[in-house]
Amino acid sequence: MEDTDRYDLRVNGGRLQESLEKVANIGATPAGGVQRLALSDEDTRARDLLVSWLEQLELEVTVDAMGNIFGRRAGCEDDLAPVMSGSHLDSQPRGGRFDGALGVLGMLEVMRTLRDHEVETRRPVVIVDWTNEEGSRFSPAMVASGVWAGALDLRWAYDRSDIDGVKLGAELERIGYRGDAPCQSFPVHAYYEYHIEQGPRLEREGKVIGAPQGIVCLQWYDVYLKGEANQVGPTPMEGRHDALCAAAEMILEVEALPREMGGDLVATVGEIQNQPNSRNIIPGEVHFTVDIRSWEDDLARRAWGVLERELLALAERRGCSVEIEETWSVARSSFDPKLVQRVLETADALDHPSLKMVSGAGHDASYVNQVCPSAMIFVPSIGGRSHVEVEQTRWQDCEAGANVLLH
């Protein structure tokens, strides 16, 4: 195509919606969300459907040792490094139907549009579905893109277990997605990840397209408290070593941390287990998680230092022992400025109001960015809601983002 009409091409918005709805039917929940935990039977069905669509497009389909699915469309100069885009099909428990899936199926629609209009690209174009982005079944998140980028070890990843002790590597084998191709990076000219914002800013400011300049740092910790279980009736309040009460105080310290430290810091306790979890037994053991995020790596580290000291002091005061593990840490990712600007300029050319911003959520682009120039394309989340069943994005915004990706 000539430069003068390069922006005339458009994706088929109705077809994109149809694809999203078909995938959303896999693992659909009663309240309108989805539950497709990584490597579950539901995730497998979504993968199978994606592969069938890629094969219909006559793409070169490859599955690597971490179950990442790649579909490659040849370019006129096929030895050049490809442009790659994608996201993930796994979900949170009772999660939303747009998170991740929009990025995979948005790129699928781009591939279909290129075929429909017989567009020949100079470079090859690759679509990818990353395994276990969410980390809700196998912790940590983004583990497969991390292995692909060389940041995480393959054997270590295979050894990650879910709550029932099932290992990630065994599940890959069970569902037939432990591929023969090595899970390692290959030359990529540019990577674009299309995603819902998962926050309120675009909607609040009346923008259709977001162009993140990067992704905040993410730090995950696991806190294990051990007190003394006992019968609730005969045991006096004085002298109890209640692990759950200690955890409750600690959780309030986590909530107070951002107010104390300032900046853009956020801190969350999202998971907790109480043992023996009986109404007439004083809790003896508690495990909970801490998630700390900030655009400033140093602020997040300093915040953890402050919090850790407080947690240790609280445990001692409550007569409980405590063990703390740092289970995952990813530094701030700053995207390629030229690619970020390209997203903004393309949105402007398509008459979509846009905004340069920061991503507060983690994405596979964080690891891919360590290997090749990367950027993301955001569209608004209605009410800023995500990782929940009521997660929604307007269909016209889904189409708008896919058109930015196309160009």
What name fits each language-model region?
Residues 2-40:
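N-terminal capping segment at the start of a domain
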Residues 16-29, 86-87, 353-404:
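Zn-dependent metallopeptidase/amidohydrolase metal-coordination segment
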Residues 28-74:
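A non-catalytic alpha/beta surface segment that caps or lines the substrate-entry region
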Residues 36-38, 268-277, 289-295, 321-340, ...:
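A short beta-alpha structural unit
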Residues 57, 69-102, 107, 231:
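Catalytic-core environment of secreted peptidases
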Residues 93-164:
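A generic, well-ordered mixed alpha/beta core segment in the N-terminal half of proteins
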Residues 133, 137-298:
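Midchain, well-structured core segments that form catalytic/ion-binding scaffolds
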Residues 231, 235-261, 306-309, 379-407:
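His/Asp/Glu-rich mid-to-C-terminal helical/loop segments that flank catalytic regions of hydrolases
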